[in-house]
């Protein structure tokens, strides 16, 4: 073992993902999940050396605090504690305040809490995780890595909304973007695959999972992205609507819908689930399509068409074009969805490598198509956000 391990924590509103990452290799030495926090069946499971274990979480204290407290004993029991040099926290929203990874102090934690209005489901939970980890691991330096940070290089023309200026100056309403850590990682890996310096490489990165976003990366920097002020905008997703005429919200309110009902529908009952009337899972959509389900077929078409439209529009943001990167659970594994997206981009001249597309699944990277017209490639690259968090934490030691 080397003294290069980082405990990476991703604290959700009712869950806690954790991993001990080797910051040199990117390997997850230990990985686990705490879930159902706040409920009677709260539990915590982990995987170490191929063996899985699960325990119940009981007690009157915060379940986040209890779970992170148990990590102290667990890392000692597994012989990992002495090699952990830092704790890295994934924080969803850094606003305009945090443009890069920072070492956590009380002031930083308070600033993260102040940004709760911009990410009410995520930032309060992130701050709870930070406070619990600082108490549990007082001797370890701790760092915050922000999903929004990579997108802080967007030019003003990309992040500015066409709205009254005071909505930005008074309320901070602008495009922030998310999945930044993922887009950052895969763009660096893509540059290595095509043997070019990242500073001279330009890609359109497509992160497709239950949440989904596209990012235009020009000479290694984010210059535009599909998610905006919140993770609700942009692409159609598992249960989220993506881009929508805002007049629809007023229309539904006038029809007697409550604000809560409107936004619950747009966040939790739209996307794949809403269009198909069946499921939010892309695998279920594809299976139902094969059985002739019309709603599933329509959801597939709407989803892939919208991704293709975003890719095509982001060519306007680039000075050159080296390729498209597919990542995220769907992007890394769904051959039919990748194929349909590239098929829609027929004017770009991508020719599928059928074997390459079949092989680039289940954790395997690869080239799945090439455009002789543009000299660009379509790549599949598994994301590794935890490794980025570990690396950026170690860099600040």
From Swiss-Prot:
GO process terms (BP): acetate metabolic process; acetyl-CoA biosynthetic process
Catalytic activity: acetate + ATP = acetyl phosphate + ADP
Magnesium found in the keyword field: yes
Cofactor list: Mg(2+); Mn(2+)
Main location class: cytoplasm
EC numbers on record: 2.7.2.1
InterPro entries, per database record: Ac/propionate_kinase, Aliphatic_acid_kin_short-chain, Aliphatic_acid_kinase_CS, ATPase_NBD
Site positions per UniProt: Transition state stabilizer: 179, 240
Pathway: Metabolic intermediate biosynthesis; acetyl-CoA biosynthesis; acetyl-CoA from acetate: step 1/2
Subcellular location per the Swiss-Prot or TrEMBL entry: Cytoplasm
Cofactor binding note from Swiss-Prot or TrEMBL: Mg(2+). Can also accept Mn(2+).
Keyword annotations from UniProtKB, A to Z: ATP-binding, Cytoplasm, Kinase, Magnesium, Metal-binding, Nucleotide-binding, Transferase
Highest taxon in the source lineage: Bacteria
PROSITE patterns in the cross-refs: ACETATE_KINASE_1, ACETATE_KINASE_2
GO molecular function, one term: ATP binding
Cellular-component GO terms for this entry: cytosol
Binding site for Mg(2+): 10, 385
Annotated binding of ATP, by residue: 17, 207-211, 281-283, 329-333
Active site: 147
Protein family according to the UniProt entry: Belongs to the acetokinase family.
Assembly with partners or alone: Homodimer.
Listed PANTHER family: ACETATE KINASE
Function: Catalyzes the formation of acetyl phosphate from acetate and ATP. Can also catalyze the reverse reaction.
This protein's name: Acetate kinase 2
Gene transcribed to yield this protein: ackA2
């Amino acid at each position: 073992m080397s003294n290069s391990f980082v405990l990476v924590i991703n604290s959700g509103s009712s869950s806690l993902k954790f991993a001990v990452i080797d910051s040199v290799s990117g390997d997850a030495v230990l990985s686990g999940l705490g879930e159902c926090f706040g409920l009677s069946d709260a539990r915590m499971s982990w995987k170490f050396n191929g063996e899985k274990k699960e325990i119940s979480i009981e007690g009157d204290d915060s379940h986040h605090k209890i779970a992170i407290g148990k990590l102290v004993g667990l890392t000692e029991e597994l012989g990992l504690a002495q090699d952990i040099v830092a704790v890295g926290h994934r924080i969803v929203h850094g606003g305009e305040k945090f443009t890069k990874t920072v070492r956590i102090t009380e002031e930083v934690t308070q600033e993260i809490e102040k940004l709760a209005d911009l990410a009410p489901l995520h930032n309060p939970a992130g701050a709870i995780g930070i406070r619990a980890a600082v108490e549990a691991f007082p001797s370890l330096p701790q760092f915050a890595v922000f999903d929004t940070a990579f997108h802080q290089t967007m030019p003003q023309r990309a992040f500015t909304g066409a709205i009254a200026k005071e909505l930005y100056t008074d309320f901070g309403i602008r495009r922030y973007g998310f999945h930044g850590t993922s887009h950052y990682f895969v763009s660096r890996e893509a540059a290595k695959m095509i043997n070019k310096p990242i500073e001279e490489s330009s890609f359109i990165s497509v992160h497709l999972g239950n949440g989904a976003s596209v990012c235009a990366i020009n000479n290694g920097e984010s210059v535009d992205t599909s998610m905006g002020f919140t993770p609700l905008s942009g692409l159609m997703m598992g249960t989220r609507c993506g881009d929508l005429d805002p007049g629809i919200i007023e229309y539904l309110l006038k029809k007697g819908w409550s604000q809560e009902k409107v936004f619950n529908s747009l966040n939790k009952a739209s996307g794949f689930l809403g269009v198909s009337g069946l499921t939010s899972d892309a695998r279920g959509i594809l299976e139902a399509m094969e059985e002739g389900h019309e709603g599933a077929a329509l959801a597939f078409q709407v989803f892939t068409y919208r991704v293709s439209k975003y890719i095509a529009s982001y060519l306007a943001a680039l000075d050159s074009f080296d390729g498209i990167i597919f990542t995220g659970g769907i992007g890394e594994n769904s051959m039919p969805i990748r194929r349909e997206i590239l098929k829609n981009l027929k004017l770009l001249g991508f020719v599928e490598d059928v074997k390459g597309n079949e092989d680039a699944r289940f954790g395997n990277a690869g080239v799945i198509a090439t455009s002789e017209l543009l000299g660009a490639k379509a790549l599949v690259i598994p994301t590794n956000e935890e490794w980025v968090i570990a690396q950026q934490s170690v860099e600040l030691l």
